[in-house]
Amino acid sequence: MLTEITFFERFEHDILMGKKTITLRNEAESHVIPGQILPVSTFETHRWFCDIQVLEVTPITLSGLTTLHAQQENMTLAELRLVIAEIYPDLEQLYMIRFKVLTK
């Protein structure tokens, strides 16, 4: 089970402002449960910037992503698919982790 989660620094503002409310992860990074509280750090420097509470974990495929998922990521669907392809090349099976920010 994950005990912390990291995000690229470019997503920090959107997370803190409540504009990014989900994250899409591979199977290895999907081991969280609803209700779990995780410290959040930047991927680049591991600087803590908030805590989140996991609300939901749902399997989803790359081809199953919708505009709603993109809105929850504060992106267009095209941008979301591009970002996922950069982070997880050639991966179809993803896991959507919906969360809320607890502390800033």
Swiss-Prot record:
Its EC number is 3.5.1.135. This is N(4)-acetylcytidine amidohydrolase. Gene3D superfamilies: Hypothetical protein. It is an enzyme of class 3 (hydrolase). Catalyzes the hydrolysis of N(4)-acetylcytidine (ac4C). Keywords: Hydrolase. It catalyses: N(4)-acetylcytidine + H2O = cytidine + acetate + H(+); N(4)-acetyl-2'-deoxycytidine + H2O = 2'-deoxycytidine + acetate + H(+); N(4)-acetylcytosine + H2O = cytosine + acetate + H(+). PANTHER family: UCP029143 FAMILY PROTEIN. InterPro entries: AC4CH (IPR008314), ASCH_domain (IPR007374), PUA-like_sf (IPR015947). One of its GO terms (cellular component) is cytosol. Signal peptide: none annotated. It comes from the Bacteria. Belongs to the N(4)-acetylcytidine amidohydrolase family. One of its GO terms (molecular function) is hydrolase activity, acting on carbon-nitrogen (but not peptide) bonds, in linear amidines. It comes from Shewanella oneidensis (strain ATCC 700550 / JCM 31522 / CIP 106686 / LMG 19005 / NCIMB 14063 / MR-1). Residues 6-101 form the ASCH domain. The active site is at 20 (proton acceptor), 23 (nucleophile), 73 (proton donor).
